[in-house]
């Protein structure tokens, strides 16, 4: 017969009660009180409480209140005169007392894990007087534990790690289960551990919960993780005990127990010879089953003919060996290289050296492929020299380039004109001879840096570049001149022999031995009585006065011509003029005032020449002003003089209609007399938008005013006339002269069907008027009807 959990708990309760009551010596204890109790004021009687030791089983599930124990006083005679009351923790709510008998019962289910004991107070009262017959006494009701809580792993699930290849018995992790039952009573809280899943790899200590390895040489590379299930069971693991489980994930951590190995014994790679230095040729990798730091590699080239051409480094992320170029490759020099490369772990574990050497080697063969390379010059830079006096077409030097490929294609030369914009030089396309194409000037450009292009004849896209530095050698082709525009002063009170100016010269040429200049006065100025020149022999000269008594009123400016010769071969010379102004000076020789009248020494311009130049300049200015004035002159407005008549003249005017053929003279008096044109013709069936005021009488006014008034009147008539042009209508004009024989061709005349005009005569005027005759001749009337 199987018992359920509830029945099993009741069974345990009965056993516990039996043990409790059998262990008591008749279960009742008497306690004498030394405290006296007074009755009726004078007599003293000793009283004492008597009660059971109270124990209550937890988790009582019965329908009736659970009997706890009985309170009894020596005073109680059993006649009902004593009343018992209960106070303290759980009184009335959990625990009740029979006031007549003193029996205590529990009315609710108790849980020791919530509260292990209750402290209460009991008192016996006289039922009639309701006064205490015994002092209040405190007692404890202890909750008796039963095995109603299973062990629990409060820290689970667990994760742990252990190095692979660990020996048997290596500690992995400790698990701990707790049981809420009373550890001081029975075996309800005594837990033992066992492993339900994870054997035969791991084991667990039953009492401590320490998990250990159970198999040797567990290999992470074969299996790196294990899931264990650990059980904790109370009642020392006996049947009927409660249990709890947890999971433990054990990861094998890596150790360096696998040496690196290349997947292949040899590798081969093809690279073009044009691959730049530092380019990657190949990547190789030695396999290592380990991970992390145990798989870190070191690569090196241990042998081969490419030790100085290639190098190998390691990629920290992928642990690959990277082979790169250290020097330029040349197919024509060497077509292949062989490298012996070793890979080794950075840190080897001495415990596993017996597994073999923790390094491996492989062979890498690198094949250099030929590419079509541009021509190569024999020198990276060609320095050349040429005199600036050399003739056009002279040879300066020669450059040479060749095709480095095995085909050795012929080379053609040219100059990169971006480096020779002025085209000073030419080059022979076949020989590479450089010649001058223009005259050279060192003072303009002393060094020409040009780029020569060399192209293969068979493949012009392959271009090599050579650099030529042409230095222009100097010749004496520039005359010396003043270092600056000199202008000095001489005081009126200057003494003879006084130095008034020190001059120097410059020369654009650069002789190898330096400049040497010679100064003197020109032949015309040598015999002047005012100034002299002293050559200081150090490329300078001093100007001195020959006399005293200079007067500004007599001569305010002197022009002294100075002759300068250089030391070149052949030597060159120039004449430069020094301006000397006569000034009024103070006592210290500082100039105060000077004027600008000039007295020219024999070597300068004459006074007559200066006057002639000034006259020419003045005449030119007058002509320019006259031209500007003529161009800016505006036309005067047209004003008719009353005494002037324009008859017998052709008058040009604008007309929006057809032109008038009548050029016969007419009388201006008709226009001047405005009385004949004052009747404003307005349409009676249309109310004009502009109401005209009464016009005053007109006086005699100028002709231009007459024309303006006439046009203004006609403009107002047109503004108020809805039938005004662009519609054809009859217009009234002032007298314009007598009619011509050919009659008028004005477009303003009516060509309606009511017109009596006849244009048949136009056909008699010849072919020039044929088109006009077709438009206005016979038969046209129907077109306009």
Curated annotation (Swiss-Prot):
GO cellular component: adherens junction; catenin complex; plasma membrane
Top-level lineage group: Eukaryota
Residues that carry a glycan: 449, 530
Keyword field contains Transmembrane: yes
InterPro entries the record matches: Cadherin, Cadherin-like_dom, Cadherin-like_sf, Cadherin_CS, Cadherin_Y-type_LIR, Catenin-bd_sf
Cytoplasmic side: 629-785
GO BP term, example: cell-cell adhesion mediated by cadherin
Keyword Cell membrane applies: yes
Entry comment, domain topic: Three calcium ions are usually bound at the interface of each cadherin domain and rigidify the connections, imparting a strong curvature to the full-length ectodomain.
Role summary: Cadherins are calcium-dependent cell adhesion proteins. They preferentially interact with themselves in a homophilic manner in connecting cells; cadherins may thus contribute to the sorting of heterogeneous cell types.
Leader sequence segment: 1-27
Organism per entry: Homo sapiens
Bilayer topology annotation: Single-pass type I membrane protein
Residue spans crossing the bilayer: 608-628
Name assigned to this protein: Cadherin-7
Keywords: Calcium, Cell adhesion, Cell membrane, Cleavage on pair of basic residues, Glycoprotein, Membrane, Metal-binding, Repeat, Signal, Transmembrane, Transmembrane helix
Domain Cadherin per the UniProt entry, residue ranges: 49-153, 154-262, 263-377, 378-482, 482-599
Extracellular side: 28-607
């Amino acid at each position: 017969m199987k018992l359920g959990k509830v029945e099993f708990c009741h069974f345990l309760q009965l056993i516990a009660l039996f043990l409790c009551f059998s262990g008591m010596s008749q279960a009742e204890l008497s306690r004498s009180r030394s405290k006296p109790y007074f009755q009726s004021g004078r007599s003293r009687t000793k009283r004492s409480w008597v009660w059971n030791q109270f124990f209550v089983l937890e988790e009582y599930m019965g329908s009736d209140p659970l009997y706890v124990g009985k309170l009894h006083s020596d005073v109680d005679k059993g006649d009902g005169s004593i009343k018992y009351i209960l106070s303290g923790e759980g009184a009335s709510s959990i625990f009740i007392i029979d006031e007549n008998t003193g029996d205590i019962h529990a009315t609710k289910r108790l849980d020791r894990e919530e509260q292990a004991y209750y402290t209460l107070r009991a008192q016996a009262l006289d039922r009639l007087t309701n006064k205490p017959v015994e002092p209040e006494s405190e007692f404890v009701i202890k909750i008796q534990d039963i095995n109603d809580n299973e062990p629990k792993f409060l820290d689970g699930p667990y994760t742990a790690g252990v190095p692979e290849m660990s020996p048997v018995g290596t500690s992995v992790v400790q698990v701990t289960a707790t049981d809420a039952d009373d550890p001081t009573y029975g075996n309800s809280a005594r837990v033992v551990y066992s492993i339900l899943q994870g054997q035969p790899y791991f084991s667990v200590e039953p009492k401590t919960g320490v998990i250990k390895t159970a198999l040797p040489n567990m290999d992470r590379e074969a299996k790196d993780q294990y899931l264990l299930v650990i059980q904790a069971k109370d009642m020392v693991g006996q049947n009927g005990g409660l249990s709890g489980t947890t999971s433990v994930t054990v990861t094998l951590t890596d150790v360096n127990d696998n040496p690196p190995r290349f997947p292949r014994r040899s590798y081969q790679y093809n690279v073009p010879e044009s691959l730049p230095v530092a380019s990657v040729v190949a990547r190789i990798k030695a396999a290592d089953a380990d991970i992390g730091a145990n798989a870190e590699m070191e690569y090196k080239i241990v042998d081969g003919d490419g030790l100085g051409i290639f190098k190998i480094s390691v990629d920290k992320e992928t642990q690959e060996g990277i082979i790169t170029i250290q020097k330029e490759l040349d197919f024509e020099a060497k077509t292949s290289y062989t490298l012996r490369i070793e890979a080794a772990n950075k840190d080897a574990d001495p415990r596993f050296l017996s597994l073999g050497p923790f390094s491996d080697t492989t062979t890498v063969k690198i094949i250099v492929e030929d590419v079509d390379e541009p021509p190569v010059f024999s020198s990276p830079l060609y320095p050349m020299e040429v005199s600036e006096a050399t003739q056009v077409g002279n040879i300066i030097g020669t450059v040479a380039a060749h095709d480095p490929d095995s085909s050795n294609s012929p080379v053609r030369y040219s100059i990169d004109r971006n480096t020779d914009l002025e085209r000073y030089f030419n080059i022979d396309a076949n020989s590479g001879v450089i010649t001058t194409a223009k005259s050279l000037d060192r003072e303009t450009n002393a060094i020409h840096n040009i780029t020569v292009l060399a192209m293969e004849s068979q493949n012009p896209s392959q271009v090599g570049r050579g650099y030529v530095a042409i230095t222009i050698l100097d010749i004496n082709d520039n005359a010396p001149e003043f270092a600056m525009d000199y202008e000095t002063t001489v005081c009126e009170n200057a003494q003879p022999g006084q130095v008034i100016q020190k001059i120097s010269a410059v020369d654009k040429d650069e002789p190898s031995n330096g400049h040497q200049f010679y100064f003197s006065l020109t032949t015309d100025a040598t015999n002047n009585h005012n100034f002299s020149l002293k050559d200081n022999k150090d490329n300078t000269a001093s100007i001195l006065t020959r006399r005293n008594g200079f007067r500004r009123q007599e001569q305010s400016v002197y022009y002294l011509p100075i002759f300068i010769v250089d030391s070149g071969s052949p030597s060159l010379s120039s004449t430069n003029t020094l301006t000397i102004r006569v000034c009024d000076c103070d006592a210290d020789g500082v100039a105060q005032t000077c004027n600008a009248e000039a007295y020219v020494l024999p070597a300068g311009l004459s006074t007559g020449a200066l006057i002639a130049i000034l006259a020419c300049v003045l005449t030119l200015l007058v002509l320019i002003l006259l031209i500007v004035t003529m161009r800016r002159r505006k036309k005067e407005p047209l004003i008719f003089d009353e005494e002037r008549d324009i008859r017998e003249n052709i008058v040009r005017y604008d007309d929006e209609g057809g032109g008038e053929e009548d050029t016969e003279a007419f009388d201006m008096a008709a226009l001047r007399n405005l009385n004949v044109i004052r009747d404003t013709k307005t349409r009676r069936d249309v109310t004009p938008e502009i109401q005209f005021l009464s016009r005053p009488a007109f006086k005699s006014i100028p002709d231009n005013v007459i024309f303006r008034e006439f046009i203004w009147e006609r403009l107002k008539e047109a503004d108020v006339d809805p039938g005004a042009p662009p519609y054809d209508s009859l217009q009234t004009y002032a007298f314009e002269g007598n009619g011509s024989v050919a009659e008028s061709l004005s477009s303003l005349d009516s060509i309606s069907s009511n017109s009596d005009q006849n244009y048949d005569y136009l056909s008699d005027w010849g072919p020039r008027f044929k088109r006009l005759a077709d438009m206005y001749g016979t038969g046209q009337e129907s077109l306009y009807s």
